[in-house]
């Protein structure tokens, strides 16, 4: 490695901040502690990077995730050693599951103390090995710029993911008068970006034979910013589109070719189309169990083409006839530049449209506020243009089903790991990254109690998110499963008492409201148009279930709770 002599000596912490700034990083989410004191001392006088002080390391990680998920930019977090680093584990695992580009600096004890059970020592490199795309422990101060440059490249290319840099305290404090050249030389890491042209031609050849084609749009379409190409392909060949949870927004919910989200809580039309299709083209979707149901019966009469940046995902769950490794945007562009093939999907489109129209959304009730009505009204008030953040649970599925999404990266949620507590900090990160966009958070009373301490920073950093808590006095999704599959034994899923959430909001200096009247709900919710941090608690029906529902292990056509029009 080539050495570069510095004009003046610099500490490791100076090199961290300067390298990040040179790579275009302008925001860090973090929480200080002993092992990162040299870095925070450098942050004190450093210009060009804004530091957001969270209230818990898990919160910092989810804030960085919200920042990254809503923009596609790298999210950066800093935590101290030992408990600071272990508190960050959930956020790192969540980012790995959802392919979120994160760079996480963990403090570490001095090099001489590593492996000797020093105060606040934890083997974070070993702990995070299964839940990171890559991780480093820096052993020389001069190596910091090279390691960071490599780490950013790894986190943001190919299939994005989290990279951890473990930084011993003395490495960050020591001065050096030279650095190793900060270049990227990774011969063993060469992600395939350009799809194979012959495989693209095979897709079109098979498409020409299809009578019932379906496009599946996963989160990879958003990450590749390929929504325009996806829609163009669907419109060119009149192919109906089903999305995964993380694929929501890649095609507008109002588009006539959109059938809805597929899978466990997917729409009737989407699940039936995936069952009956004879040719499925999946783009940026990993075929997780929440989408496929029983994999043995999933699309069992279909040929399957699978486009994915990660070759490890192709054929992992579902047998694939036409594998295509490469960037989703480039693959779709190639499909659009090839000569047009001829097919007639008129009868198929007529059939799936009928399926779409024969199902009513939900039964309206007069005496209780229904969560679906809340989300629909927020959709109207925000004109379907807000960044929607959710926590995890029933409200997450209702938000996926009933908000009128229009754009990619519009839904920010914890998909693969299903992390309760994700919502509040992720909404903060999304708003900091998108100050000119409305950011609305839907959260349950369970998840809200896990990370609500992050509300403390809303006024400090002027983050006017709208927190809408759908309060059903329970862990709603757990309760739903207990009522459906455990003979109604709601073991430890109902809250016998709850704190006064209105007082909590007041304690944080946040404008707060509580609504429980279905007759005035439409008018009540108009308060969200004010540009201030806001907490809205809505008491909703305590018995509402998310429907339709495919029971675990069942096939997608075996949906429960489908309500047809008379």
Residue ranges and their predicted role:
Residues 119-120, 314-317, 323-325, 329-333, ...:
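Thiamine diphosphate
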Residues 13-17, 21-26, 39-43, 353-430, ...:
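Active-site diphosphate/adenylate-binding microenvironment
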Residues 57, 116-117, 190-202, 262-266, ...:
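A general structural motif
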Residues 224, 271, 326-329, 368, ...:
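Conserved structured core elements
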Residues 164, 306, 389, 442-443:
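Generic enzyme active-site microenvironment
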Residues 2-341, 377, 381-384, 457, ...:
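N-terminal alpha/beta PP-like core and its mobile active-site loop of ThDP/TPP-dependent enzymes
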Residues 31-33, 52-62, 77-84, 139-140, ...:
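Active-site nucleophile and cofactor-binding loops and adjacent substrate-binding regions
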Residues 2-7, 142, 301-394, 503, ...:
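Phosphate/pyrophosphate-binding active-site segments
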């Amino acid at each position: 490695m080539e050495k570069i002599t510095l004009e003046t000596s610099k500490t490791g912490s100076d090199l961290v901040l300067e390298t990040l700034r040179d790579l275009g990083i302008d925001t860090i989410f973090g929480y200080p502690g002993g092992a990162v004191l040299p870095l925070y001392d450098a942050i004190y006088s450093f210009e060009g990077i804004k530091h957001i002080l969270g209230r818990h390391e898990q919160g910092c990680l989810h804030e960085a995730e919200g920042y990254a998920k809503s923009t596609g930019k790298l999210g950066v977090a800093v935590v101290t050693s030992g408990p600071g680093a272990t508190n960050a584990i959930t956020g790192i695992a969540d980012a790995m599951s959802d392919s979120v580009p994160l760079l996480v600096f963990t403090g570490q004890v001095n090099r001489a103390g590593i492996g000797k059970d020093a105060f606040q020592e934890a083997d974070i490199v070993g702990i995070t090995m299964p839940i990171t795309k890559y991780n480093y422990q820096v052993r020389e101060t001069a190596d910091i710029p090279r390691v960071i440059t490599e780490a950013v490249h790894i986190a943001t290319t190919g299939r994005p993911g989290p990279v951890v840099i473990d930084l011993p305290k003395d490495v960050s404090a020591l001065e050096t008068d030279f650095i190793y050249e900060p270049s990227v030389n990774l011969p063993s890491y060469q992600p395939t970006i350009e799809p194979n042209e012959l495989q693209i031609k095979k897709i079109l050849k098979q498409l020409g034979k299809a009578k019932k084609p379906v496009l599946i749009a996963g989160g990879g379409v958003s990450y590749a910013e390929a929504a325009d190409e996806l829609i163009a392909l669907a419109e060119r060949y009149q192919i109906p589109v089903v999305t995964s949870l993380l694929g929501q927004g890649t095609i507008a919910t109002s588009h006539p070719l959109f059938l809805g989200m597929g899978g466990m809580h997917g729409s009737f039309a989407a699940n039936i189309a995936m069952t009956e299709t004879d040719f499925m083209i999946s783009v940026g979707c990993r075929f997780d169990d929440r989408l496929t149901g029983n994999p043995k019966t999933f699309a069992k009469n279909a040929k399957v083409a699978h486009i994915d940046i990660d070759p490890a995902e192709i054929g992992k769950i579902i047998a694939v006839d036409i594998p295509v490794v490469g960037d989703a945007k480039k693959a779709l562009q190639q499909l659009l530049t090839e000569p047009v093939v001829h097919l007639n999907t008129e009868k198929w489109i007529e059939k799936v449209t009928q399926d779409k129209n024969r199902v009513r959304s939900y039964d309206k009730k007069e005496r209780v506020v229904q969560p679906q009505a809340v989300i629909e009204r927020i959709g109207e008030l925000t004109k379907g243009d807000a960044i929607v953040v959710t926590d995890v649970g029933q409200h997450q599925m209702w938000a996926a089903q009933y908000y009128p999404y229009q754009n990619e990266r519009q839904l920010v949620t914890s998909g693969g790991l299903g992390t309760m507590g994700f919502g509040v900090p992720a909404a903060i990160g999304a708003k900091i990254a998108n100050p000119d966009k409305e950011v609305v958070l839907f959260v349950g009373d369970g998840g809200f109690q896990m990370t609500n301490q992050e509300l403390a920073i809303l006024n400090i950093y002027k983050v006017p998110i709208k927190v809408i808590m759908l309060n059903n006095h329970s862990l709603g999704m757990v309760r739903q499963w207990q009522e459906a599959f455990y003979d109604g034994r709601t073991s430890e899923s109902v809250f016998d008492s709850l704190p006064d959430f209105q007082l909590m909001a007041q304690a944080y200096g946040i404008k707060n409201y509580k609504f429980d009247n279905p007759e005035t709900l439409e008018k009540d919710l108009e308060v969200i148009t004010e540009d201030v941090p806001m907490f809205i608690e809505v008491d909703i029906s305590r018995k509402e279930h998310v429907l339709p529902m495919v029971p675990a292990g069942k096939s997608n056509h075996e949906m429960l709770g489908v309500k047809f029009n008379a």
